[in-house]
Amino acid sequence: MKRKFVGAAIGGALAVAGAPVALSAVGFTGAGIAAGSIAAKMMSAAAIANGGGIAAGGLVATLQSVGVLGLSTITNIILVAVGTATGARAEGSMGASREQESGPQDPPQELQEPQEPPSCKKQDLNLGKFVGAAIGGALAVAGAPIALSAVGFTGAGIAAGSIAAKMMSAAAIANGGGIAAGGLVATLQSVGILGLSTSTNIILGAVGAATGATAAGAMGACREQEPGLQDLQQEPKEPQEPQELQKQQEPQEPQELQKQQETQETQETQELQKTQEPPSYEK
């Protein structure tokens, strides 16, 4: 449960902070559309399709306005809701524990076969980023109605006893019994019933794609193989017999020194034999 709260907080923060990052990455910056960027190509294609102009309220105009002026408070609230739901779900699935089986347990880690180190190829990391971007974008767009429905803004209206009902009650008390048009509760209620607009879905998809690609890149970072693992992967050497080990440990004398010792021993033997011979008595 604690991990879900942490994941929800991180997801909400990344959703709000990731929107300007994602828009700036494709070229919708605070100073305008960056030359040679994806945004510039989108603007060129939209101008050709509209006979030389950019349609007001269209995709390019909306993203350009968001890049220059930033997101509205309502859009940020929706992003927080989507990021919170997505982060909590991701953290809950990653932190789910496996129940311990009642049968025989697995052997210790030292006795298991050493696994190959993770692949550090650049192609694998790029593929992981593309997959993470696709999953993040899909989750962001699909998670908006789920997040709104979870707090009580459903397609049939505000659910009784939900967080949305408490928000509506507080707003009604603050406004003297009515709900202000264009306010937070009215906007979320409208989104819950009618759904998000195309431009908002595009922004959500961009934020989710940027967040998913960043997460996939961080999770796919390779760790270098530790030097001790190579020693563990080598086959153990057979123990040597004591006699062979003793032979290896005995120092071998040089051949010249051995010849000198043999010559010296021969001379000493000859001198000893001469001294031991009995004297001869000749007549």
Swiss-Prot record:
Q: GO molecular function terms here?
A: identical protein binding
This protein's UniProt keywords: Antiviral defense, Apoptosis, Immunity, Innate immunity, Membrane, Mitochondrion, Mitochondrion inner membrane, Transit peptide, Transmembrane, Transmembrane helix
Write out the GO biological process terms: defense response to virus; innate immune response; intrinsic apoptotic signaling pathway
Kindly indicate whether the keyword Transit peptide belongs to this entry.
yes
Q: Name one GO cellular component term.
A: mitochondrial inner membrane
Q: Do you know which Gene3D superfamilies this protein is assigned to?
A: 6.10.110.10
Transmembrane portions of the chain: 130-150, 176-196, 202-222
Give the matching InterPro entries.
IFI6/IFI27-like, IFI6/IFI27-like_sf
Transit peptide, start-end: 1-90
What's one Pfam family here? Ifi-6-16
Bias (Low complexity)? 242-283
Residues covered by region (Disordered): 90-120, 227-283
Q: Superkingdom of the source?
A: Eukaryota
Query: What induces this protein's gene, according to its Swiss-Prot or TrEMBL record?
Result: Up-regulated by type-I interferon. Up-regulated by poly(I:C).
Compartment(s): Mitochondrion inner membrane
The answer on whether this UniProt entry bears the keyword Transmembrane helix reads yes
Q: How does it sit in the membrane?
A: Multi-pass membrane protein
Its biological function?
Answer: Functions in the intrinsic apoptotic signaling pathway and may have an interferon-induced antiviral activity.
Similarity field = Belongs to the IFI6/IFI27 family.
Its quaternary organisation is: Homooligomer. Interacts with BAK1. Interacts with BAX. Interacts with adenine nucleotide translocase.
Protein name listed in UniProt: Interferon alpha-inducible protein 27-like protein 2B
Species per Swiss-Prot/TrEMBL record: Mus musculus (Mouse)
Lineage, please? Answer: Eukaryota, Metazoa, Chordata, Craniata, Vertebrata
